[in-house]
From Swiss-Prot:
InterPro entries: Ribosomal_uS2, Ribosomal_uS2_C, Ribosomal_uS2_CS, Ribosomal_uS2_euk, Ribosomal_uS2_euk/arc, Ribosomal_uS2_flav_dom_sf
Disordered as annotated region, ranges: 266-297
Intracellular or extracellular location(s): Cytoplasm
Key words, A-Z: Cytoplasm, Ribonucleoprotein, Ribosomal protein
Role of this protein: Required for the assembly and/or stability of the 40S ribosomal subunit. Required for the processing of the 20S rRNA-precursor to mature 18S rRNA in a late step of the maturation of 40S ribosomal subunits.
Domain of life: Eukaryota
UniProt xrefs under PROSITE patterns: RIBOSOMAL_S2_2
Keyword Transcription regulation appears in the UniProt entry: no
Summary of subunit composition and partner proteins: Component of the small ribosomal subunit. Mature ribosomes consist of a small (40S) and a large (60S) subunit. The 40S subunit contains about 33 different proteins and 1 molecule of RNA (18S). The 60S subunit contains about 49 different proteins and 3 molecules of RNA (25S, 5.8S and 5S). Interacts with rps21.
Name listed for the protein in its UniProt record: Small ribosomal subunit protein uS2
Gene behind this protein: rps0
Annotated organism of origin: Sclerotinia sclerotiorum (strain ATCC 18683 / 1980 / Ss-1)
PANTHER family assigned: 40S RIBOSOMAL PROTEIN SA
């Protein structure tokens, strides 16, 4: 890493450098744009251009100082048409008070004052100059400064401050936005000191696929306790739970005994039925005969 041109208070810690390397912020593309040559460290044998992490940190601090110099945070617009940066810009806007445009940038946001989405920001920050080219083009029409996360092959036309980093990976994009938000909060005084840790985890800025999260939840529900015993595992184990079947057999025996008792009860009803019904008509016939004789007399 090249010697830093920043005051000692802005020097990165070893943890910051480790995070940048772990998120692969130093890995660029195989193509190199001429204006990104000052940020190049070296080129690997496989053709990948390696970015100087020291330059990345210097530009993060410079961009944070520019952002902190704007009095009204709502005058800052953060933009990301790339899906990997949409969650990051939304979290950055929530923590710093900026206005986020996540997704497609509507043409005319900065130039057509008739539209409802018309904005007049004092500064815009984009995730990728290539995918956010429309926003940068309109900002150049109305003289809005632009801060951009630039890879080695990113066009730097109309970009005022380029933060050299890998702007194609979900972890690298999230980490740079997280570090930028942390530096802004430190300069504003929201974080007590530079030695104090920010309580917001960097994972909050990482992109998450909604479908993958739903599939993950479904898999966790399928792995509920006891689910394996009635699934394929039970077949592999040869239905080891024969004790349950024996208990069921005992229960079936109880049902058999109950049915035998019911059959015995049916036999007693059959035996009692003819005697009772045979005796009743006879008695009834005698009574009617007696009453008829009485009426005749």
């Amino acid at each position: 890493m090249a010697p830093s041109q920043l005051p000692a208070i802005f020097n990165p810690t070893s943890q910051d450098i480790e995070q940048l390397l772990a998120a692969q912020c130093h890995l660029g593309s195989k193509n190199l744009q001429v204006h990104m040559e000052p940020y190049l460290w070296k080129t690997r044998p496989d053709g990948i251009n390696v970015i100087n992490i020291g330059k990345t940190w210097e530009k993060i601090v410079l961009a944070a100082r520019i952002i902190a110099a704007i009095d009204n945070p709502a005058d800052i617009c953060v933009i990301s048409a790339r899906p990997y940066g949409q969650r990051a810009v939304l979290k950055f806007a929530a923590h710093t008070g900026a206005v986020a445009i996540a997704g497609r940038f509507t043409p005319g946001n900065f130039t057509n004052y008739i539209t409802r989405s018309f904005k007049e920001p004092r500064l815009i920050i984009v995730t990728d100059p290539r995918t956010d080219a429309q926003a940068i083009k309109e900002a150049s029409y109305v003289n809005i400064p632009v801060i951009a996360l630039c890879d080695t092959d990113s066009p730097t036309e109309f970009v005022d401050v380029a933060i050299p980093t890998n702007n194609k990976g979900r972890h690298s994009i999230g980490l740079v936005w997280w570090m930028l938000a942390r530096e802004v909060l430190r300069l504003r005084g929201s974080i007590a000191s530079r030695e104090a840790e920010w309580d917001t985890m960097v994972d909050l800025y990482f992109y998450r696929d909604p479908e993958a999260e739903e599939n993950k939840d479904a898999i966790e529900e399928a792995k509920a306790p006891g689910a394996d015993e009635v699934g394929a595992a039970a077949v592999d184990q040869g239905f080891a739970g024969t004790g349950d079947w024996e208990v069921s057999g005992a229960t079936a025996g109880a049902f058999t005994a109950a049915s035998n008792t019911a059959a015995a009860g049916g036999a007693s009803w059959d035996a009692a039925e003819p005697s009772d019904w045979a005796a009743t008509p006879a008695a009834a016939g005698q009574e009617w005969a007696a009453s008829g004789a009485t009426e005749q007399w």
